[in-house]
A protein has these predicted regions:
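A broadly tuned preference for mixed-charge, low-complexity surface segments
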Residues: 178-183, 239-253, 289-304
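Membrane-interface aromatic/basic loop that binds lipid-linked glycans or pyrophosphate carriers
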Residues: 6, 254-305
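Catalytic core of nucleotide-sugar-dependent glycosyltransferases
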Residues: 202-208, 214-237, 249, 253-267
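Short intrinsically disordered, low-complexity coil segments enriched in acidic
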Residues: 1-3, 70, 138, 225, ...
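A structural preference for long, well-packed, hydrophobic secondary-structure segments
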Residues: 21-23, 74, 157, 184, ...
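Nucleotide-sugar donor-binding/catalytic module of glycosyltransferases
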Residues: 2-223
Length: 305
């Protein structure tokens, strides 16, 4: 009983989990954007994933200066393993993630926490990605509606969302998988009762050309395709064509057997290149679409002569 009381008294409102690995040039911008949000009832968990640069020292420096900062030093295990370590330490009623290449727009967290406080039924709140993803103020009771209406399969990112802690009671990120968010996010959606989006706040995503996903090869894209095919989420024609594009790239780069089942789509849903792809799908099938995609890429390659 005493331990339960202590645990309750030590709980924070918000836990911000930031995996850290080889980001000494962007880490200060990231961490300062979080610490300057004006949320006192917050813990910032910096997970040093065995970073070989100056990041471990930087993390310890923040912990010495700001009591809200907690640091985990661990052997390198990858992004999923680092996030999972942060989840295990987190005591917040709400969880959120920030990648250490990125940063958070001023005054974002206070506004999001106010929304969550006013709507105790919200289990998950998604907010905009600056210059990349605009959202409306909407509430979804059905996972299918949210998944398809917002094209959530295109923004399964862990980071531009606030989660109630209980969603992670039995869910963790898959260690050893690339595109780990695509595996995890559908599980979180199924665990949620109410999902909401807001136009308030902003997450600054800063692409890193050296990241694993930016340098994804055929094996990585095959993993991405598997994540989508195994997620059990509803599929409309637009989502199907998105998967057909991934399947085409996987087939071209690996020669692996086609795993996406054949399907007819409504041509009226598409325009331009997508409409042409839809026509090929309906008339010739998914394998011919893959072959056509490969041929086009070969023709676009510059000649060595």
């Amino acid at each position: 009983m005493i331990l339960q009381i202590i645990s309750y008294l030590c709980r924070m409102l918000l836990s911000v989990i930031i995996p850290v690995y080889r980001v000494e040039h962007t880490l200060q911008r990231c961490v300062e954007s979080v610490l300057s949000q004006g949320v006192d009832d917050m813990e910032v968990i910096l997970v040093d994933d065995g970073s070989p640069d100056n990041c471990p020292v930087l993390c310890d420096g923040w912990a010495e200066k700001d009591a809200r900062v907690k640091v985990i030093h661990k052997d390198n295990g990858g992004l999923s393993d680092a996030r999972n370590a942060g989840i295990e330490m987190a005591t917040g009623d709400y969880l959120t993630f920030v990648d250490s290449d990125d940063y958070v727009k001023d005054d974002t967290y206070p506004a999001l926490l106010q929304i969550m406080a006013e709507h105790p039924d919200y289990d998950l709140l998604e907010y905009p990605i600056v210059n990349r993803l605009s959202l409306e103020d909407r509430t979804y009771q059905q996972t299918q509606e949210y998944w398809l209406d917002t094209k959530a399969y295109l923004h399964t990112y862990a980071w531009n969302k606030i989660y109630r802690r209980h969603l992670f009671d039995d869910i963790r990120f898959p260690v050893g998988k690339i595109f780990e968010d695509v595996y995890t996010f559908p599980q979180l959606l199924r665990a949620a009762t109410t999902i909401a989006t807001t136009q308030i706040g902003g997450y600054h995503y800063c692409p890193n050309p050296q990241s694993i996903t930016a340098q994804a090869d055929g094996a990585a894209l095959s993993m991405l395709l598997d994540a989508h095919l195994q997620n059990g989420m509803p599929m409309d024609d637009i989502y199907y064509l998105h998967l057909a594009n991934i399947q085409s790239d996987v087939w071209e780069r690996t020669g692996q057997p086609i795993r996406l089942a054949a399907r007819q789509v409504d041509i009226a849903h598409f325009h331009g290149k997508d409409k042409l792809k839809a026509i090929i799908l309906n008339t010739l099938g998914i394998k011919k679409l893959c072959q056509t995609n490969k041929l086009i890429h070969l023709l676009k390659k510059p000649s060595r002569w």
